[in-house]
Regions:
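Histidine-rich, glycine-flanked metal-binding segment
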Residues: 2-11, 16-54
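Fold-independent oxyanion-binding glycine-rich loops
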Residues: 14-15, 20, 49, 56, ...
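Short amphipathic alpha-helices and their capping/turn segments at secondary-structure boundaries
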Residues: 44, 48-51, 83-90, 151-166
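Metal-associated gating/positioning segment near the N- to mid-region
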Residues: 51-120
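Hydrophobic faces of well-ordered beta-strands that scaffold small-molecule active sites
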Residues: 58-60, 98-100, 137-141, 164-168, ...
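Structural motif
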Residues: 93, 161, 248-249
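Metal-coordinating catalytic core of metallo-dependent amide/deamination hydrolases
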Residues: 105-238
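Active-site-adjacent C-terminal substructures of enzyme catalytic domains
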Residues: 139, 227, 236-267
Length: 267
């Protein structure tokens, strides 16, 4: 929608326009789907009554689309209407470019995401091609490196035209996102409806599997992304060691690196 070059010219007037370095009281004139110029606040057009007018937001990481596919326990919505609903929410929030974050692989919970991945990507590519989205939708592949199935899955989807960002993550408990192993055990028992002893055994198996397969899976994902020139983000960096690991991998984007550099994170 936002790339339309045949859209009629229109003016948004009497607005507080947020630019890169100032807030300007004026009007924005749009022609051929692009901002043509900024004019005086009293030009004829659609009056905003002094409200703020900001550039469209870019959301690099939203898991929101999966919420529409699984709106409640035991319910799965078809990808096409789920994506349409997601698109509406995105635009209502001022986001004009969204990187829909889809899980490639699974730690243990939400294993259904493996089956969801391909149908969602196919539906997204079709909707993009047919111009059914209002926002620009791109793909952010969140690759679970503690799952050996991630290798095959990433090879199947990383060539999709919309893939523009990859992140590597390891949700095995005891490090990064989940430090409290016991809380993970309790969550596993609740979500998978199994006894605590079984949940604890499954958790121990997951931790062991992460140590065994994560280095190889991580390297595979990194190589696949690098071969296509796709940027890679680290995920859930909690310590300087995590940041150093990210920095050692040439093209990794690490948000926490900036925090450490600024003295906002010391461990």
């Amino acid at each position: 929608m936002f790339d339309a070059t045949d859209a009629p010219e229109y003016r948004l007037t009497d607005a507080r326009i947020v630019t890169a370095d100032a807030v300007i009281h004026g009007s924005v004139i749009v022609a051929d789907g692009r901002i043509a110029r900024i004019g005086a606040p009293d030009e004829p057009g659609i009056g905003l009554g002094g409200d703020y007018l900001i550039p469209g937001l870019v959301d690099l990481h939203t898991d929101h689309v999966e919420t529409h596919v699984f709106p409640r326990n035991g319910v799965t919505w078809a990808p096409e209407p789920a994506l349409a609903a997601h698109d509406g929410v995105v635009v209502a929030g001022g986001v004009t470019t969204v990187f829909d974050s889809l899980c490639v692989g699974a730690a243990m919970h939400n294993a259904a995401r493996r089956e969801l991945l391909l149908p969602l990507i196919e539906a997204l590519e079709a909707a993009r091609a047919e111009g059914r989205f209002r926002a620009e939708h791109l793909l952010h592949l969140r690759c679970e490196v503690c799952d050996p199935a991630t290798v095959e899955l990433v090879d199947r989807v990383i060539g999709s035209p919309s893939v523009r960002l990859v992140s590597v993550m390891d949700h095995a408990p005891g490090d990064r996102q989940v430090l409290d192993v016991e809380s993970w055990v309790q969550e596993t028992a609740r979500d998978m409806k199994v006894p605590m002893d079984e949940a604890r055994a499954l958790t121990e198996e997951l931790i062991a599997r992460s140590k065994r397969v994560s280095p190889e899976v991580r390297a595979h994902v990194m190589a696949a992304a690098r071969a296509r020139g796709i940027p890679v983000m680290s995920h859930d960096d909690r310590s300087e060691a995590h940041v150093e690991e990210a920095q050692a991998q040439a093209d990794v984007i690490a948000f926490v690196r900036n925090l450490v550099d600024r003295g906002l994170l010391t461990e």
